[in-house]
């Protein structure tokens, strides 16, 4: 995974409350056997009309927001079903971070584990940032992962990350990498465990041999 000490770029306003994962990635795009091509389905019913033509008024279809890499959204972003495709679609589209007052719990976990940064701020602070980025010339946002601060034209605010998620971004670790980084502690725990409970050691292999 990529190391992220800072995420910055143009932000697009998406002030929609309770935007669920079914809207972020509609069901017809879940039929693929791999992750490829999910950018096409991102927010499909918002980006395109019933005739399949782009809706020119939708923010991500506006030329001035074509380079957007950050979304500033309403509360409860990513609620609904647990489809991880919503995260993959956002990332394939080029979105690197979402700022909102709150997120769906499962979506938050999926996003952070896939290196999509989610920043939860007070609703008033998100409102200030939304006002900024509603003018394309004021839409540059900087998210400093190390200091856990976000900066727009009118606001600098702090946000919280768990130490595990912060480390994953700063060191470019996925879940497997984060686990492997704790190998010494895992081996030490295992050694203590087997010393205290020797009758459990290799119980799986002994059971297998007995049943063979």
From Swiss-Prot:
Pfam families: Aconitase_C. Keywords: Amino-acid biosynthesis, Branched-chain amino acid biosynthesis, Leucine biosynthesis, Lyase. GO terms for cellular component: 3-isopropylmalate dehydratase complex. Gene3D superfamilies: Aconitase, domain 4. Transmembrane segments: none annotated. Belongs to the LeuD family. LeuD type 1 subfamily. HAMAP family: LeuD_type1. Heterodimer of LeuC and LeuD. This is 3-isopropylmalate dehydratase small subunit 1. It comes from Chromobacterium violaceum (strain ATCC 12472 / DSM 30191 / JCM 1249 / CCUG 213 / NBRC 12614 / NCIMB 9131 / NCTC 9757 / MK). The gene is leuD1.
């Amino acid at each position: 995974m990529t190391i992220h000490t800072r995420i910055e770029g143009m932000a697009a306003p998406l002030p929609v409350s309770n935007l669920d994962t079914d809207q972020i990635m509609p069901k017809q795009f879940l039929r693929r056997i791999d992750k490829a091509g999910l950018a096409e389905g991102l927010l499909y019913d918002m980006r395109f009309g019933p005739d399949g033509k782009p809706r020119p008024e939708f923010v991500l279809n506006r030329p001035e927001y074509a380079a957007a890499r950050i979304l500033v959204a309403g509360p409860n972003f990513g609620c609904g079903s647990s489809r991880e495709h919503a995260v993959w679609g956002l990332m394939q589209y080029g979105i690197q971070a979402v700022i909102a007052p709150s997120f769906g719990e499962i979506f938050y976990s999926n996003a952070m584990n896939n290196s999509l940064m989610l920043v939860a701020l007070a609703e008033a602070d998100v409102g200030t940032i939304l006002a900024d980025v509603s003018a394309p010339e004021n839409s540059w946002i900087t998210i400093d992962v190390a200091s856990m601060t976000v900066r727009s034209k009118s606001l600098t605010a702090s946000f919280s990350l768990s130490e595990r998620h912060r480390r994953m971004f700063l060191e470019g670790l996925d879940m497997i990498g984060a686990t492997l980084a704790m190998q010494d502690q895992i081996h030490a725990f295992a050694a203590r465990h087997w010393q205290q409970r020797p009758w459990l050691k290799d119980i799986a292999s002994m059971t297998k041999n007995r049943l063979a």
